[in-house]
Design a protein with these regions (language model features):
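An anion-binding loop in the catalytic cleft
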Residues: 62-159
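Active-site-proximal loop/hinge segments within enzyme catalytic domains
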Residues: 1-99
Length: 159
């Protein structure tokens, strides 16, 4: 299955893969029930395990490239939310879009408007549509206004 450039866990897993998994499970149950199933062992050499995505994984490192950070943010959306820090507190990032490069220090806020919060990165920028700094996700613009974060402001690495 092709993975698009804006996929998140929600769009890829819940909207695309989960329905296919349900179909495959129904087919497998029908094969077992009818005696047509042909079991085979999993090749352990090709098996892999992905543990839970926690804050150790979700912390954004501003030394990484814009492409790597964009992928991390999308991979942590909707949970737990990749994060940067503002005044030492995590700001989790959602609904992100990779933008062209800007000549600014990574973590610098370029602008914040109804379209989202734009943060400079190495080799690009990230437009963030929603954030979670306290309990609930909210539009990035509402958070930025409340936090006094605007153009010229700075977010720090999450790690």
């Amino acid at each position: 299955m092709p993975i698009g450039p804006r996929e998140t866990v929600t769009s890829l897993f819940f909207e695309k893969l989960q329905p296919l998994g349900v179909e495959a499970l129904v087919e497998a149950v029908e094969q077992v029930a009818s005696g047509r199933a042909r079991p085979r062992a999993q090749d352990e050499a090709r098996a892999s395990f992905q543990g839970l995505v926690d804050d150790a994984v979700a912390a954004v490192d501003l030394r990484k490239s814009a492409v790597e950070i964009d992928r991390l943010v999308r991979g942590c959306d909707p949970q737990p939310g990749a994060f940067l820090r503002l005044e030492g507190k995590p700001v989790r990032l959602f609904d992100a879009e990779l933008l062209p490069a800007l000549d600014l220090t990574p973590g610098s806020v370029v602008r914040c408007d109804a379209a989202g919060l734009v943060v400079a990165l190495r080799g690009g920028a990230l437009r963030v549509g929603r954030v979670r700094a306290d309990q609930a996700k909210e539009p990035a613009q509402a958070f930025a206004e409340r936090a006094g974060l605007g153009a010229g402001g700075r977010l720090e690495s999450g790690a």
